[in-house]
Amino acid sequence: MSTWRKRLATAGLSVALVAGGIWVLNRLDEAPLPHAERVTTTASLDIARGRYLARAGNCLACHTRQGGVAFAGGRGIETPFGVIYAPNLTPDRETGIGARSASEFWRALHNGRSRDGRLLSPAFPYPSYTRITREDSDAIFA
């Protein structure tokens, strides 16, 4: 086999290994969500605590575009990977997270996974948010 064919074969194998590695890493930590019903009534203390945590975490900074409705998303954030648009975090069932469960919110916040299991990178999981407890995540979701 000639030298250029060996190099081509090595390059092809390298690309295949990298692609396979990326695929495997994308599937790690993809545990199924528990089947839990969405809580329809929430204690006012949880709502107040969630409001406090959302403000302390500065969620408005990314999830509110200039002059827009609080937490309604749409703000474009320049990154080395291109512009990322923050999603709507309002309780609206069609455009926000109102149709989501607390478990789905936790999975996005803590594990950086979408409702269907896709990675939300490069934005999530945001390193400091992986330390948020499930209890705090549920309060923010409330």
Predicted regions and their residues:
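N-terminal/domain-start segments enriched in small and hydrophobic, helix-friendly residues
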Residues: 22-40, 94, 110, 121, ...
